[in-house]
């Protein structure tokens, strides 16, 4: 069933649940129920429209293509064709396994510069992204580590792909590359200068880093969205392969409002159903690789298992919210 059809079915179920409640207690004003329901529904629609426009579905699985070391990095091996071949293999595995999008990331370039990367990295990633565009049809995003959002936006705009990931868009984080300051004002002005419609997915309190000062997750989420102008937010665990805390994910979901929330690390087919109770999508890599090992290539069978598990988690979440006593409405008479 298509996403739009599923959405219509859920809408009908919720309206039916409303009618049953009012029939049982006529003193509860139906218009009050309907007004509250409509506001919630409009919020859900706005969020889903943004995701569907980008990923062609409301709860996407976004796999990550970890590029082998690129030219100028400390572990560069001198064979760019091997880098391209591995990237093509992993993109194909993601697409054939049913992923709804992918991020191209210079993961194996560590140790990273904290801001601007070498021009050779920008050139190499541009070539690879262009190759992948002609190989797969799923949306492509870019993350230039550790935090070269400007280069990521330039590559994405010139290659005409859909989105970028930014590790530090707002705030100040202490990282193994040093202190990194978010530069949302520079990035968003640059996006305007380029006339770009590339979406910006931004980490909040990113992994492998600690915020300077007293961290407040709710404030960080709100600042990233309303002051940093992020199109979506990402919540990760403390490191690659570690899931976010469920309570923190719930707080982030509440603070984000209409803005999509993605799980940014640690999701696997055992925990993704629980994580999706408070998220709109998942960015995943480690658990998709052979034997779950970060250095191994992506396995399309593991991709399919993950996509199936996430879809089941979303179905369970939506079923629980569709009227079986899980949805409550204010008792305000009109």
Model region roles, listed by residue range:
Residues 52-79, 193-209:
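N-terminal small/glycine-rich loop or linker at the start of catalytic domains
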Residues 61-65, 104, 140-144, 166, ...:
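Hydrophobic faces of well-ordered beta-strands that scaffold small-molecule active sites
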Residues 101-124, 171-175, 234-243, 292:
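Glycine-rich, proline-tolerant flexible connector loops at the mouths of alpha/beta enzymes
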Residues 115-141, 184-200, 244-263, 303-313:
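Alpha-helix-loop-beta-strand connector modules within alpha/beta enzyme cores
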Residues 147-159, 267-281:
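Catalytic cores of alpha/beta
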Residues 157-230:
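Conserved anion-binding
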Residues 162-177, 234-239, 265, 279-299:
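Glycine-rich phosphate-binding active-site loops on the catalytic face of alpha/beta enzymes
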Residues 179-183, 290-318:
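C-terminal helical cap(s) of enzyme catalytic domains, especially alpha/beta-barrels
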């Amino acid at each position: 069933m298509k996403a739009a059809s599923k959405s219509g079915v859920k809408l009908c179920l919720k309206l039916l649940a409303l009618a049953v409640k009012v029939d049982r207690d006529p003193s509860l004003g139906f218009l009050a129920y309907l007004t509250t329901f409509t506001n919630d529904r409009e919020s859900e629609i706005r969020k889903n429209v943004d995701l569907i426009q980008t990923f062609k579905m409301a709860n996407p699985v976004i796999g990550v293509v970890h590029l082998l070391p690129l030219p100028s990095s400390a572990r560069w091996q001198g064979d760019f064709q091997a880098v391209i071949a591995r990237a093509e293999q992993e993109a194909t595995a993601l697409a054939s396994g049913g992923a709804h999008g992918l991020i191209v990331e210079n993961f194996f370039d560590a140790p990273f510069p904290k801001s601007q990367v070498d021009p050779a990295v920008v050139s190499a990633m541009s070539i690879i992204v262009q190759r992948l565009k002609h190989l797969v049809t799923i949306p492509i995003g870019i993350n230039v580590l550790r935090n070269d959002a400007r280069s990521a936006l330039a590559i994405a705009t010139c290659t005409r792909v859909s989105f970028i990931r930014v590790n530090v868009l707002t705030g100040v984080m202490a990282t193994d590359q040093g202190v990194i300051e978010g530069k949302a004002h520079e990035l968003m002005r640059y996006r305007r200068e380029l006339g770009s419609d590339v979406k910006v997915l931004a980490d909040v309190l990113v992994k492998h880093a600690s915020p300077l000062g007293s961290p407040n997750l709710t404030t960080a989420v709100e600042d990233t969205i309303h002051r940093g102008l992020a199109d979506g937010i990402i919540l990760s665990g403390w490191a690659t392969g570690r899931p976010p805390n469920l309570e923190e994910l719930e707080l982030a979901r509440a603070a984000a409002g209409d803005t999509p929330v993605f799980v940014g690390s640690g999701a696997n087919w055992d925990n993704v159903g629980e994580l999706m109770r408070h998220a709109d999508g998942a960015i995943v890599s480690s658990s998709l690789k052979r034997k779950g090992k970060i250095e191994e290539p992506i396995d399309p069978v593991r991709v399919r298992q993950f996509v199936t598990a996430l879809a089941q988690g979303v179905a369970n979440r939506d079923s629980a919210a569709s009227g079986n006593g899980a949805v409550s409405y204010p008792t305000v008479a009109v």
